[in-house]
Amino acid sequence: MRTMALLATLLLSTVAFPMIASADVCSTVDVLEFDGNNANESVTTQVEFGPRIPGSNASMELRNWFMETRPEFDWRLDPHHRGGYNLTNLEGKLTPLDSTDETPVIVLAAHYDSRHRAERDPNPDMTEQPIPGANDGGSGVAVLWELARIIPTLNLDHEIWILLTDAEDQGSNDDPSTWVLGARAWAENQTQDDINRTDAFLLVDMIGDADLKIYRTFPPSLNNEEGNR
């Protein structure tokens, strides 16, 4: 039940964060303590750091801010050199007092970098400028930052890992291998024990749209099964 409460909080946060004016949703979120205003304010903080391009001072400031404001977690910087970038993943762990080598794990993840160029901007004068990253990058971090305030109070029976990955959005549209570099590095360094203990991996990304639409997607192997339901 305690783990389900965390999952419910996360799911509600993805609804309540961009639409905090909804009375029905907010009354539920109040019970679970997720504060959409806190999350929104943290987006402002992130944007004020500047573009979070891998290796930048803004990236370092964001990592330091996250660690300093959420000291209940055991934080670790995980640097890599991939695709021409010096990137740094940030991983924090919160373990129950009775944790063992077999305690199950829930991973909550988001990327914190912002793209180095806005090639889709309708203003041609802006296409070579970095994006602010309020939604793409900032919104996922905001949800995890607010959840990191709540989680230590829930007395969960799982280990909770918060993972902020770097160099996710710096790739070339012509080469899929140049994207999600931080996540690839993290995944490649997971041990078999880590994999066996992981009960859930939840990725939060781009949930800050004013007109948020969340679509259900299925692996190809499930398409026929879903269509028959």
Predicted regions and their residues:
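Secretory targeting signatures
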Residues: 1-24
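Structured segments of extracytoplasmic/periplasmic soluble domains
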Residues: 45, 49-52, 65-73, 115, ...
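A generic secondary-structure signal marking the coil-to-beta-strand transition
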Residues: 88, 104-106, 198-202
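Solvent-exposed, acidic/flexible segments
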Residues: 32-39, 55-63, 85, 133-141, ...
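A non-catalytic alpha/beta surface segment that caps or lines the substrate-entry region
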Residues: 28-32, 38-100
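Acidic/histidine-rich catalytic neighborhood of metal-dependent amide-processing enzymes
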Residues: 128-226
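Solvent-exposed loop/turn segments at secondary-structure junctions
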Residues: 52-54, 81-84, 98, 112-116, ...
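Catalytic-core environment of secreted peptidases
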Residues: 39-42, 48-49, 90-165, 174
